[in-house]
């Protein structure tokens, strides 16, 4: 199943803070996310203490926070270094 990916303003704002190498890594991971959000290399996990928020790893430091928005849409909420998980 293919998912459609949408973004929040917060995600776009924080995306601009990443360096070029991190953005290139993100592009590859988003291609995988569209096809299979639970693909092993994404290391997708539900965020502890939440019902509908998930994270996946861009690399060992950068994380993306997301949630399902219906059956075929993934909404990217935030991106940043590992500490962003403390906000959720």
Regions of interest found by a model, annotated:
Residues 2-5, 9, 13, 20-24, ...:
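Enriched for short, Lys/Arg-rich terminal
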Residues 10, 25, 41-45:
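Unusually extended, aromatic-enriched hydrophobic runs near protein termini
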Residues 23-28, 49:
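Phosphate-binding glycine-rich loops and adjacent basic patches that engage nucleotide phosphates
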Residues 27, 34, 77:
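A cross-family signal for key residues in well-ordered alpha-helices
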Residues 31-56:
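A short, surface-exposed loop/turn module that caps and links secondary-structure elements
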């Amino acid at each position: 199943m293919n998912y459609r990916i949408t973004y929040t303003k917060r995600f776009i704002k924080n995306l601009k803070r990443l360096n070029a190498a991190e953005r290139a890594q993100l592009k590859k991971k988003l291609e995988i996310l569209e096809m299979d959000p639970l693909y092993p290399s994404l290391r997708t996990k539900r965020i502890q203490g939440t019902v509908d928020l998930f994270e996946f790893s861009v690399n060992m430091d950068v994380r993306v926070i997301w949630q399902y928005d219906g059956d075929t849409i993934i909404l990217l909420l935030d991106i940043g270094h590992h500490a962003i998980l403390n906000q959720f």
